Amino acid sequence: MGTLRRFPASVLQIALALFLLASGARDLVHVDAGVFNAAVYFLGGLFRGHVAIGVLTLAVSLCCLTAGFFLLVDFLRPELSCVSAVLALFVVLWALNMVLVDVVGAFGRGKVLQNVSSALEHLHHTAVDLLVLGALIFVRQHTR
């Protein structure tokens, strides 16, 4: 029965690990911050520099790769104790991204409510962010 209860968490953990690994690798190859791109450019604009954007992009990509790596390692070797701390840090990073992109960035530029298409696009992006945040929290609770 314990294995059957763990199955949904395992599937979600593998999916999340692959998503984060692929996102981090893609972001390094394409030199953008992927799902965090809007937040990186928002923060880069505050610091007024392309160097800040490059450093933030690299940091975000490495965070995605690190979180995905730890999730995959934890799936294969569940006795690893630092995974919960890494996931907690990534939950905070993801929530901060959501605030910066889905709230401050979107409504600050005033483009969300321009038309139905932009509102639906924003709603879709926010829903994806919430799904990933929920998956991170769920997997973190089940890796303890």
Curated annotation (Swiss-Prot):
The lineage of its organism: Bacteria, Pseudomonadati, Spirochaetota, Spirochaetia, Spirochaetales. This is Uncharacterized protein TP_0638. Keywords: Cell membrane, Membrane, Transmembrane, Transmembrane helix. It is found in: Cell membrane. It comes from Treponema pallidum (strain Nichols). One of its GO terms (cellular component) is plasma membrane. It comes from the Bacteria. It is a multi-pass membrane protein. The chain crosses the membrane at residues 7-29, 51-73, 85-107, 122-139.
